[in-house]
Design a protein with these regions (language model features):
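Glycine-rich phosphate- or other oxyanion-binding loops that anchor nucleotides, phosphorylated ligands
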Residues: 20-166
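Glycine-rich loop at the start of a catalytic domain that most often binds anionic cofactors/ligands
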Residues: 5-19, 93-97
Length: 166
């Protein structure tokens, strides 16, 4: 997400692919998004890192926006961590605080689950009773606090943009 480009220096990079090298991969038009898929290790754990993402407001379809996640699923990822910069409506939050999602509200006009269901990617209607893993939330909370960040949990509202989500 915005502001986390320095994380790349923590990766033991084995190889990178430019998005242009990957068939059907969208290319980000947002300044500062370098457009690379990085394969490597962080603390001996294999990772795939997107250096730049695509936004619905750039004119891509929802299927194009989620295509990279689907590719990574086929490559064998079992855990997906996402980050971004967003606005907020909670007056207790300050610029630079970290918010870990415990739920979300989708106000986008389209849904990536529309269209033909691909069974290998999951069910037509995923269980949304607990959309975010509580163990991962707790671990992320502890790590962020240990690094000195003000940490909150909250509900993310996704909007089409172009503006920061809340």
């Amino acid at each position: 997400g915005t502001g986390l480009g320095g994380l790349v220096s923590e990766i033991d990079i084995k190889f990178t692919l430019s998005y242009e090298q990957i068939p059907h991969f969208p290319v980000s038009t947002v300044e500062g998004h370098s457009g690379k898929l990085i394969f490597g290790y962080i603390s001996q754990r294999p990772v795939i890192v997107m250096q730049g993402r695509f936004h619905y407001y750039e004119g891509y379809t929802m299927q194009q926006v989620v295509f990279p996640v689907r590719v990574m699923k086929y490559l064998g990822i079992s855990t997906l961590l996402l980050s971004n910069a967003s606005g907020g409506v909670n007056p207790a939050f300050e610029i630079g605080d970290v918010m870990i999602l415990n739920d979300h509200i989708n106000l986008l006009p389209n849904n990536p689950l529309m269209g033909k269901n691909i069974k290998e990617l999951g069910p037509r209607f995923p269980d949304m009773s607990e959309p975010y893993d509580k163990k991962i939330i707790a671990k992320a909370h502890g790590i962020a606090q240990g690094l000195g960040y003000n940490v909150h949990e909250g509900v993310y509202v996704s909007v089409s943009g172009p503006c920061f989500e809340t």
